[in-house]
């Protein structure tokens, strides 16, 4: 039986337009996992596991509401609550896997299909570094491969972006290529553009290992990148906003508080990468070794350039 799940290799690009120009790009890989194939993938692949540790893994608790219900069941409930009927069609999750036990996804996307394969809806699951998540469930109105959708920002994700923003999504349905582009706009115009672009690969042990060697500890690099880029923005003089809660509007920090926070921003990149579930034996030692490598990335100006 041929798999519908795939591996995608590509890059993420961020371009901040206001209040200070700032951009970066780095290479990553993602898995597009058919939720109905997870038991089969767990049996067929040697280096990937579902809900158990391996070189690469997917843990249900890293997504959705973190509860005991399956990701498929949670997605179905969300769709039903929005009056979206897929007729039981496939749902595929685009995400980065845990690598050596560590995983962080700034955004995961559920592609929800009708039985005939047409897209019915997209679920955008946004994660922040405070451990919070919010899911935007948006129906697909058009029948083409390119999907355009929009929603209001609902989760505090960056101390350098206010809450009163609108997200515009431009997504291509997964094929040989994949694009997920996001534009964040406020009252004064566009403040941020970001895009994920990737090429499809078969999901095999060999391709997973190739991607893993090409982009080691990608999730740790992503977390380190978030804090490193935050530091660069702070050094450029962009106002640092205090988080007032999951849905609250952030307020600017007093300059003295910004100075006290500087050490926290510097330390966070290396500290975050050690916040993982310990693995036994060689895998645990390898993760610690890789963590030391990633811990130095915040000192390099070009650390996340291709």
Q: Which ranges hold each PLM region?
A:
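Mature, function-bearing regions of proteins
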Residues: 1-270, 306
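Coiled-coil-like amphipathic alpha-helices with heptad-repeat character
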Residues: 22, 294-295
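Alpha-helix boundary/capping motif
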Residues: 273-278, 287-293, 299-303
